[in-house]
C-alpha cells in the first residue's frame, strides 16, 4: 500500500516540461547509492577489520567467495561512478542556477561532504600501502584544528599512530555514514519537491508542467541503462583501471612510495591542499575547496538565473571545469617543479572563479538597463 502510494505520488509529480538530460543525474545517483549499500552489505559479511587480516580478507573475498570479485569490483567502480555523477550534478546546478534554491543546494553540499568522508574511510579499509598512507596524511591534518586538533586526531586514530583501533573506527564509520547519506538524500528530495526543479531557460517552472510518468520516466531509464552498461563493462573487462598499483601491496609503515595519490575523485582537492607549503593553509584550502560552494547563493548578482544566455559567465564556468581537470592531473604527478607551479596556479584560478562570478552579473545588469 505504501509502495503504491509512493509510486503514484512520484508518477503524478508535476515536472517542468523542458528539463534536459542533465537533470537525469539525480535518479542515477539514487541507483548508485543503492548499488553501493547492497554490495557493501555483502562485502561486510566477509571483511575483517584487523590490520593483520584486512588485506587477506579482501584477497579471500575476490578469490574464494562466490561472486566476491563481482561485489568487490562493483563496489570500487561504483564509487567512481557515484562521484562522476555527483560532480556532473553539481556542475549542472552551478550552470543552470539551481543554487538559488538555498535549502536544496545546502543539503546537496552536505551530501557531497558526507559522501567524501564515506569514500575516504572506505579507501582505507583494504589496508594496502596507499590506504595506509592516505589514512596517515588525512588524520594528521586534523592536528591543525586549534585547541581540539590533537584530541580529535588521537580519538579518530584510537592512539598516537595509525593502528588496529584506527581500522576498526574507520570500518564503523564507513558502515554508518551511508545511512546519513540516505537521510540527507531524503531531505534533499523533499526540499526539491517543495520548491520544484529549475530548468535550462531559467524561467518560472510553474508556467508549463507535466506529470513525471511516463514522459520523464523513460528518459531516466535510458540514462540508467547507459550507467549500468558502463559500470558492468568496466567491472567485467578493466576492473583495475582506476586502482593504484601501490594498493595491491599490504601496508608497510617502513616503505614510502614516490608520492601519495588518493582516488581520482579526491585529486582536485588534494592538489589544492599540497599546492600550499604550509600544513594549516593546506588543510584550510582542502576544506574550502568544497565549503566555498555554500557561498554561491549569496554571490549571485545577475537578473538572469542560468548561464544559458550569459556568455561571460559561461566562459568562467568552462574555465572552472578546465581548472578542475588540470588540478586532477597535477595531483597524479610528483611534488616537484613544474607540477607544483601548475597546481598553485590552478588552485588560484579555482578560487578566483567564485570571487569573479558576481562581476559578469553586475555588468549584465548595468548594460541591460533601458536608457
UniProtKB/Swiss-Prot annotation:
Essential cofactor(s): heme b
Similarity remark: Belongs to the cytochrome b family.
Function per UniProt: Component of the ubiquinol-cytochrome c reductase complex (complex III or cytochrome b-c1 complex) that is part of the mitochondrial respiratory chain. The b-c1 complex mediates electron transfer from ubiquinol to cytochrome c. Contributes to the generation of a proton gradient across the mitochondrial membrane that is then used for ATP synthesis.
Positions that bind a ubiquinone: 193
UniProt binding sites for heme b b566: 89, 188
Keywords: Electron transport, Heme, Iron, Membrane, Metal-binding, Mitochondrion, Mitochondrion inner membrane, Respiratory chain, Transmembrane, Transmembrane helix, Transport, Ubiquinone
Additional comment: Heme 1 (or BL or b562) is low-potential and absorbs at about 562 nm, and heme 2 (or BH or b566) is high-potential and absorbs at about 566 nm.
Topology with respect to the bilayer: Multi-pass membrane protein
GO biological process: mitochondrial electron transport, ubiquinol to cytochrome c
Protein name stated in the entry: Cytochrome b
Predominant place of localization: mitochondrion
Amino acid at each position: 500500500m505504501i509502495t503504491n502510494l509512493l509510486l503514484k505520488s512520484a508518477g503524478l509529480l508535476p515536472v517542468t516540461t523542458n528539463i534536459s538530460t542533465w537533470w537525469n543525474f539525480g535518479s542515477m545517483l539514487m541507483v548508485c547509492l543503492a548499488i553501493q549499500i547492497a554490495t557493501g552489505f555483502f562485502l561486510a559479511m566477509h571483511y575483517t577489520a584487523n590490520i593483520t587480516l584486512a588485506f587477506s580478507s579482501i584477497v579471500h573475498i575476490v578469490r574464494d567467495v562466490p561472486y566476491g570479485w563481482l561485489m568487490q569490483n562493483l563496489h570500487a567502480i561504483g564509487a567512481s561512478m557515484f562521484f562522476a555523477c555527483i560532480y556532473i550534478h553539481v556542475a549542472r546546478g552551478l550552470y543552470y542556477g539551481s543554487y538559488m534554491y538555498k535549502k536544496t543546494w545546502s543539503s546537496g553540499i552536505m551530501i557531497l561532504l558526507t559522501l567524501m568522508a564515506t569514500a575516504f574511510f572506505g579507501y582505507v579499509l583494504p589496508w594496502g600501502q596507499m590506504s595506509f598512507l592516505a589514512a596517515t596524511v588525512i588524520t594528521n591534518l586534523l592536528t591543525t584544528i586549534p585547541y581540539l586538533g590533537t584530541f580529535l586526531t588521537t580519538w579518530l586514530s584510537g592512539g598516537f599512530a595509525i593502528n588496529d583501533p584506527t581500522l576498526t573506527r574507520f570500518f564503523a564509520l564507513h558502515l554508518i555514514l551511508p545511512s546519513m547519506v540516505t537521510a540527507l538524500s531524503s531531505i534533499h528530495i523533499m526540499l526539491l519537491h517543495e520548491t520544484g526543479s529549475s530548468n535550462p531557460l531559467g524561467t518560472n517552472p510553474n508556467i508549463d508542467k507535466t506529470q513525471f510518468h511516463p514522459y520523464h520516466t523513460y528518459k531516466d531509464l535510458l540514462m540508467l541503462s547507459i550507467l549500468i552498461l558502463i559500470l558492468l563493462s568496466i567491472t567485467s573487462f578493466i576492473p583495475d583501471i582506476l586502482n593504484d598499483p601501490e594498493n595491491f601491496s599490504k601496508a608497510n609503515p617502513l616503505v614510502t612510495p614516490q608520492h601519495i595519490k588518493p582516488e581520482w575523485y579526491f585529486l582536485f582537492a588534494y592538489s589544492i591542499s599540497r599546492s600550499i607549503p604550509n600544513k594549516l593553509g593546506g588543510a584550510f584550502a582542502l576544506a574550502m575547496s568544497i565549503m566555498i560552494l555554500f557561498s554561491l547563493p549569496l554571490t549571485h548578482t545577475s537578473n538572469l538565473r542560468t548561464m544559458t544566455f550569459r556568455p561571460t559567465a559561461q566562459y568562467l564556468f568552462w574555465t572552472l571545469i578546465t581548472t578542475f581537470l588540470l588540478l586532477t592531473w597535477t595531483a597524479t604527478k610528483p611534488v616537484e617543479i613544474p607540477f607544483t607551479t601548475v597546481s598553485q596556479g590552478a588552485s588560484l584560478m579555482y578560487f578566483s572563479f567564485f570571487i569573479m562570478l558576481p562581476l559578469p552579473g553586475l555588468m549584465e545588469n548595468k548594460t541591460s538597463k533601458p536608457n
